[in-house]
Amino acid sequence: MGTPGEGLGRCSHALIRGVPESLASGEGAGAGLPALDLAKAQREHGVLGGKLRQRLGLQLLELPPEESLPLGPLLGDTAVIQGDTALITRPWSPARRPEVDGVRKALQDLGLRIVEMGDENATLDGTDVLFTGREFFVGLSKWTNHRGAEIVADTFRDFAVSTVPVSGASHLRGLCGMGGPRTVVAGSSEAAQKAVRAMAALTDHPYASLTLPDDAASDCLFLRPGLPGTTPFLLHRGGGDLPNSQEALQKLSDVTLVPVSCSELEKVGAGLSSLCLVLSTRPHC
């Protein structure tokens, strides 16, 4: 038997989707979203892909940009992946639901078992789902409802699944994330701290907690692409984006910190974990 939580972050592949020109205008990105600097957004996205491929050594698969899917680069909302199973989500926004099609095919081609939502009353954004290595927490938010959370529980029956209220327009992973198999990192806002308190009340597992000045800094990815026993990585927002949180992140001494920027993509709602899907095609990972 492995150590509880040891499966957290095991990965061999990463999936991203290119940034389309339609994201550069507020109209293309959707009602209420600001215009952004397309070239800067594409540079940020390119650097992220380079870090995943070169620094972490992952097999990188990049779906081409689609002008009809301005928010297509936020493909972390389109699937929840654990082990060899991928739950294809039903995003809250009807305009975003076609985004799942290309992701579904890519994950099928990688040999994952595909599970569909199959309920028109359910909504689920993937960035409302936090996997700790031991259990799932699903944020009940503007984007994800109870029925969506129930389908997560039905899909991943080997794990406990608990729901956490999320206020405002945030996703759960925009408030908290995993800094390691036993460490929850969370922002300092009342919404983030409320979510962490709710998680602590619901779990049977002890987690350490690290508070970061910026909520967005907690949207990080703990990744173990190497063999067991090798030092894991923490992909996180760097000092150019969130300088106030860098000192606190240094307290995570058991990981190699890999900073990236997504300050331009953040303008249209992108958090770091929304910009990629990571998975393992290796057995027993």
Swiss-Prot record:
Query: Does the keyword Hydrolase feature in the UniProt annotation?
Result: yes
Task: Describe how it is modified after translation.
Answer: Phosphorylated by TBK1. Phosphorylation inhibits the translocation into the mitochondrion upon Sendai viral infection.
- Which EC number applies? 3.-.-.-
The entry's active site is 171 (proton donor), 276 (nucleophile)
Q: List the record's Gene Ontology CC terms alphabetically.
A: mitochondrion
Which is an annotated GO molecular function term of this record? hydrolase activity
EC class: hydrolase
Entry similarity comment:
Belongs to the DDAH family.
UniProt-recorded name of the protein = Putative hydrolase DDAH2
Organism for this UniProt entry? Rattus norvegicus (Rat)
